[in-house]
Amino acid sequence: MSQLQVRHDWKREEIEALFALPMNDLLFKAHSIHREEYDPNEVQISRLLSIKTGACPEDCKYCPQSARYDTGLEKERLLAMETVLTEARSAKAAGASRFCMGAAWRNPKDKDMPYLKQMVQEVKALGMETCMTLGMLSAEQANELAEAGLDYYNHNLDTSPEYYGDVITTRTYQNRLDTLSHVRASGMKVCSGGIVGMGEKATDRAGLLQQLANLPQHPDSVPINMLVKVAGTPFEKLDDLDPLEFVRTIAVARILMPLSRVRLSAGRENMSDELQAMCFFAGANSIFYGCKLLTTPNPEESDDMGLFRRLGLRPEQGAAASIDDEQAVLAKAAAYQDKASAQFYDAAAL
C-alpha cells in the first residue's frame, strides 16, 4: 500500500529548493514517488477536440483563438453532434480512453447548456471518459454538467499569481480559482495545470505548482504545457525555454501532487523523443493523442505509438462499450440533424 503523504501547505521556498536540486537527484526523487502510486510504463491517453473554434473575447497573449489577434484562424460554429461522435469513435479506436471537448468561450451561455449536456451523455455512451473546457463556469452550470455525467472539467491557472497579469487581463486569477471550486463542489474531477515558456521566471513556475498543490484537493489531472508560439499573438517572439527546465517542472509537479495524473500536454510536436522520454521518467503519465490540440499541432498517432514501443510504454485501458451501444448513439446523433436550425446557431459569434 502506498505510504505517500499528500500535502496542501507547500511553501514557495520549499518548491524552489526542489527545482534547484541536481537533475539526477530531482529525477530520482520524482521517479521513486511516481512508482509508489502508478505503473511507470502505463500512460493515459486523451483526445482533445475543438467543438467551437476562434472568436474568443479574452486577451490571453498565448492564444491564437483570441479575437483580439490576427492569427489567420477562421472561426467555426459549434460542431454538429454527429461530427463530435465520429471524432470520439475515432479517438477510441486509436486507443484514447478520455475524450476532451473544448470551446473558445469566456463562459458558456445558458442556451448552450442543453446541447453540451447531451454531447456529454452521447460520448459517455461510447464507453469513454469525458472532459470539457468551456471557460469560466457558474456553480449552477458546474452542477448541470456534473448531473449530465461529465467526468472532468479543465480550467488552467496558466501561471503564478504574480506573473498572471502579464499574460491575461480579461479575467482574474480569482475567477479561475472560483471555477475550480465550483467544479470540485459539483462532484466532477478537476483538470488544471498551466503553461511554461511564456517569459516567466523560475519562481513563477514554482508559484504555479504551489497554487495547484495547495488547493483543498489536488487536481486529478495536471496538464503541463510548453508554449506553442503562434504568429500574430503577443508571445510569438519569446525566447524558447530550456527544455531541461520543462523536465524539472514535470518532476516537481509529480513530487508535489503524487496522486495526480501529470499530463505532457501542448508543445510535444517540438520536443525530441529523448526529451519526452525524460518527462515520462520524471512522472508524466498522460498525453493528448492526435495530430492537433484544439488549433495547435501535435505528433501523429503513429509517431506516438512508435515512441511508446521504443520506450516499452503502453496505453492505459479505458472502459468499453458494445457495438450495439455505439450504433445506437450514432443513430441518436443523426436525429439531431433535423433540429439544426434550433441548435446549430453560430456559437462563434461574439
UniProtKB/Swiss-Prot annotation:
InterPro entries, per database record: Aldolase_TIM, BATS_dom, Biotin_synth/BioAB, Biotin_synthase, Elp3/MiaA/NifB-like_rSAM, rSAM
Documented EC number(s): 2.8.1.6
Residues annotated to bind [2Fe-2S] cluster: C100, C131, C191, R263
Cofactor: [4Fe-4S] cluster; [2Fe-2S] cluster
Domain Radical SAM core: 41-268
Annotated [4Fe-4S] cluster binding sites: C56, C60, C63
Keywords, alphabetical: 2Fe-2S, 4Fe-4S, Biotin biosynthesis, Iron, Iron-sulfur, Metal-binding, S-adenosyl-L-methionine, Transferase
Gene Ontology molecular function: any one: 4 iron, 4 sulfur cluster binding
Residue stretches spanning the membrane: none
GO biological process, one term: biotin biosynthetic process
Reactions mediated catalytically: (4R,5S)-dethiobiotin + (sulfur carrier)-SH + 2 reduced [2Fe-2S]-[ferredoxin] + 2 S-adenosyl-L-methionine = (sulfur carrier)-H + biotin + 2 5'-deoxyadenosine + 2 L-methionine + 2 oxidized [2Fe-2S]-[ferredoxin]
Name this polypeptide is given: Biotin synthase
